[in-house]
Amino acid sequence: MSDSKSDGQFYSVQVADSTFTVLKRYQQLKPIGSGAQGIVCAAFDTVLGINVAVKKLSRPFQNQTHAKRAYRELVLLKCVNHKNIISLLNVFTPQKTLEEFQDVYLVMELMDANLCQVIHMELDHERMSYLLYQMLCGIKHLHSAGIIHRDLKPSNIVVKSDCTLKILDFGLARTACTNFMMTPYVVTRYYRAPEVILGMGYKENVDIWSVGCIMAEMVLHKVLFPGRDYIDQWNKVIEQLGTPSAEFMKKLQPTVRNYVENRPKYPGIKFEELFPDWIFPSESERDKIKTSQARDLLSKMLVIDPDKRISVDEALRHPYITVWYDPAEAEAPPPQIYDAQLEEREHAIEEWKELIYKEVMDWEERSKNGVKDQPSDAAVSSKATPSQSSSINDISSMSTEHTLASDTDSSLDASTGPLEGCR
């Protein structure tokens, strides 16, 4: 919009402690979530005639970390196009020049709930396996673009009442680092893999550990490894899964290895005891077979040593998951990331600001030319789920509240209720 941008295109509304200055096309703003990265409102898009989520990035230029994350999120959202990853519908700023530039608004699909609201419900095998399949498809698509998430958790995965699932964000930047001995919990890290906790190198199946933790929580209705900090979480991991082998210990940095080797030794608990038959659905002989398959999948995902952990492709072909396999979803063409140095870029804050401003202006220019002024197919409709049975086509009744909030489990509006129909 640059020079043609006028104050008359925008209006301001107070949302909690923040002022949203948005395009007039977005009406009926209602706060639905907040976190370290921003505040999210549900709104009605009067141009497209659909409900959307409007996210205001919180102080994107307060430091280099925030600025880099904002740039990374914007670039990736513009490039990624997959039914199991949230769609970006619009990007704008009310400021007219680079010098004034302070606020970034992202407009995305509006979903019905995040996984926190579904994960403790009584899900049958059909629903559970379909949700996991979609997670794996979304993860594989990110991996195909060289994006390894490393921070998957229920609060950044969203669902609709028809059981469709989407990943909200793109996780930790490759340059993000952690200090095993010193890092406290700033956000939920119950789902982070041992190699992230221990400061090791990692590969794509780092995200499989997170899926395993999420699946375990679906089954147990409680967090599997609820550590107070990284050290406490590591202790909870080895208490349940057992102390890893000497071969694994050799892969650790000396200071970390010294700590880990001096912990008490644990034999681990059998998966049949961690996940006994009675906690799974068991209404039929078929359920009993699926229970055995589900437990086998858990045992292959929740493996401390990443070299022995199942891969994303292997998980998609596992008997518990493969019933849903569709090449169009699981083998979708990779997104073309146009910034090859995205993960490695380091800039001063003002340089990040200019890069982000250029991305916003690029979007606005393309929108004026008609490139981006239509909703994505995923935003207004979704392909029927593979099953035609009513049990999977309805995670209903969904709350009438909606969500698109990712940073913390507590970010959801308290009025957003569980999905009653799945109980």
From Swiss-Prot:
GO terms for biological process: apoptotic signaling pathway; cellular response to reactive oxygen species; inflammatory response to wounding; JNK cascade; modulation of chemical synaptic transmission; positive regulation of apoptotic signaling pathway; positive regulation of cytokine production involved in inflammatory response; positive regulation of macrophage derived foam cell differentiation. A motif (TXY) lies at residues 183-185. Residues 26-321 form the Protein kinase domain. Dually phosphorylated on Thr-183 and Tyr-185 by MAP2K7 and MAP2K4, which activates the enzyme. Autophosphorylated in vitro. SMART domains: S_TKc. GO terms for cellular component: cytoplasm; cytosol; mitochondrion; nuclear speck; nucleus; plasma membrane; Schaffer collateral - CA1 synapse. Residues 387-416 have a biased composition (Low complexity). It catalyses: L-seryl-[protein] + ATP = O-phospho-L-seryl-[protein] + ADP + H(+); L-threonyl-[protein] + ATP = O-phospho-L-threonyl-[protein] + ADP + H(+). GO terms for molecular function: ATP binding; JUN kinase activity; protein kinase activity; protein serine kinase activity; protein serine/threonine kinase activity; protein serine/threonine/tyrosine kinase activity. All four isoforms are widely distributed in brain. Isoforms alpha-1 and alpha-2 are predominantly expressed in hippocampus, cerebral cortex, caudate-putamen, amygdala and the granule layer of the cerebellum. Alpha-1 is more abundant than alpha-2 in the periaqueductal region and the substantia nigra. Residues 366-375 have a biased composition (Basic and acidic residues). Induction: In T-cells, following T-cell receptor (TCR) activation. Levels peak 48 hours after TCR and CD-28 costimulation. The modification Phosphothreonine is found at residue 183. Its cofactor is Mg(2+). The active site is at 151 (proton acceptor). ATP binds at residues 33-38, 55. Interacts with MECOM. Binds to at least four scaffolding proteins, MAPK8IP1/JIP-1, MAPK8IP2/JIP-2, MAPK8IP3/JIP-3/JSAP1 and SPAG9/MAPK8IP4/JIP-4. These proteins also bind other components of the JNK signaling pathway. Interacts with NFATC4. Interacts with ATF7; the interaction does not phosphorylate ATF7 but acts as a docking site for ATF7-associated partners such as JUN. Interacts with BCL10. Interacts with CTNNB1 and GSK3B. Interacts with DCLK2. Interacts with MAPKBP1. Interacts with POU5F1; phosphorylates POU5F1 at 'Ser-347'. This is Mitogen-activated protein kinase 9. The lineage of its organism: Eukaryota, Metazoa, Chordata, Craniata, Vertebrata.
